Amino acid sequence: NGVCMHHDLGCLGAAVNTRAIERHLQILKEMGCNGIRCSHNPPAPELLDLCDRMGFIVMDEAFDMWRKKKTAHDYARYFNEWHERDLNDFILRDRNHPSVFMWSIGNEVLEQWSDAKADTLSLEEANLILNFGHSSEMLAKEGEESVNSLLTKKLVSFVKGLDPTRPVTAGCNEPNSGNHLFRSGVLDVIGYNYHNKDIPNVP
């Protein structure tokens, strides 16, 4: 019985107020909730401390976008330079919390689809960003995995290198077999945010 929980606290805004977070969790518990998805960014440490103490399980989410922007000035501007450092700090900070049962590497990232900008990188850019054992010659071969699938593999591998004990997922909003995150084959749990009626049609 889980919910997606954004980091703001209503009229209090995004500032951390431990008592307000505790009250929020108490209300959720009274509703029968026992699971939290931190959407769509790392939560305040205070939230995880409270979830540890109050008996919630947490899906801890790192990113709301990768390299393809959703708004003009979002994290996509910094992804190439900062994603490894931020993912490293995120996992190391949160991995000792017993409430955390799964990592999420992204929410509805636009790299799910073939028309995402990630598929139009030059070979040099792709190798620079991915650095995942694929030469530019390999990437150029017909039938080679998409850059988006390789990026998914890279992120999951990075997470598993820091914490091999927990499954990794991503929140996806188009359940079809062409989804590059699905096609990577590395997500332990396939996240479907919508289109429940279509789920039986996806292998």
Task: Enumerate the predicted regions with their spans.
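Active-site-adjacent substrate/metal-binding segments within catalytic domains
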Residues: 1-115, 141, 153, 168
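Active-site neighborhood of glycoside hydrolase catalytic domains
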Residues: 53-55, 79-203
